[in-house]
A protein has these predicted regions:
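Conserved anion-binding
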Residues: 54-159, 169, 173-177
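Conserved, mostly hydrophobic/aromatic
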Residues: 20, 146, 195, 227
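N-terminal glycine-rich anion-binding loops that anchor highly charged ligand groups
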Residues: 18-29
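Glycine-rich beta-to-alpha transition loops that act as phosphate-gripper elements at the mouths
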Residues: 3, 7-15, 60-71, 119-124, ...
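Generic hydrophobic/aromatic pocket-lining and core-packing "Φ" positions
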Residues: 17, 46, 71-75, 135, ...
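Glycine-rich phosphate-binding active-site loops on the catalytic face of alpha/beta enzymes
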Residues: 27-38, 80-95, 145-155, 198-224
């Protein structure tokens, strides 16, 4: 795995793809920020992004928070040529045997499409599963990708909920079993010096790559470039 992390940029529309790629994005993600941390975009939007990227980099899609209707709501998305799909676990019951429904869904994914296990660092606010438990689950069931993120998008960032040393331990433990790890959580480029010991496969960004630093803004190529330069 590379020593220098790549950059995952979440776009809202196909119109943002060119600026994201020109700024140096190594993976394009699709989400609708107005619908939450992992807000699901309309399938037509996701399809247009896949078409615009045209195989230049991998493409992932956020599909909302997992629940009884999650697969139905994502039916058309799962027909698209996506490399990764992910559901958040906000409100997910932390009970013995949790995750069996996720494993069932993963088995039904098209060939070549991977499910990303999502760990919310602010798991208490999200009423979700603790990150260490998600990491253990991902290792046990050989998930090929994990996202460490925050659920509630406010003035706080990932570092308000997890210490760099703890984050590094999670990331390194997953990478040792050949799981790709993306780290998000409303981070800003100027916070990277605090994360010197954290080497994920990708830093995942949206708000700090948008004009005005607002996640509901539009992708700004210069801000994407700033991230690439900060990563090194």
């Amino acid at each position: 795995m590379p020593d220098t992390p790549g950059l995952l940029v979440s776009v809202r529309t196909a119109d943002e793809v060119d600026d994201a790629l020109a700024g140096g994005a190594d993976l394009i993600d699709v989400k609708e920020p107005a619908r939450g941390a992992l807000g699901i975009a309309e399938p037509e939007v996701v399809g247009a992004v896949v078409e615009k990227v045209n195989g230049r980099v991998p493409v992932s899609a956020a599909l909302g928070e997992w629940g009884p209707t999650a697969l139905t709501e994502a039916h058309w998305h799962l027909e698209l040529k996506l490399d990764y799909v992910k559901w958040g676990l906000a409100g997910y019951p932390h009970t013995p045997g949790w995750g069996e429904d996720l494993l069932d869904a993963r088995r039904g994914l098209p060939a070549g499409m991977e499910m990303v296990a999502v760990a919310y660092a602010d798991w208490e606010r999200a009423k979700s599963i603790p990150p260490a438990e998600v990491a253990k689950f991902a290792k046990r069931f050989r998930f090929r990708a994990v996202l460490i993120d925050t659920c509630v998008k406010d003035a706080k960032t990932l570092l308000d909920f997890i210490k760099p040393a703890e984050l590094a331990e999670l990331v390194d433990g997953l990478k040792r079993v050949y799981t790709k790890v993306a780290v998000g959580g409303s981070l800003r480029p100027e916070q990277l010096p605090k994360l010197k010991g954290v080497v994920p496969d990708y830093f995942a960004v949206r708000g700090s790559a948008c004009a005005g630093g607002k996640r509901d803004g539009v992708i700004d190529k210069s801000r994407v470039k700033k991230w690439k330069e900060a990563i090194g």
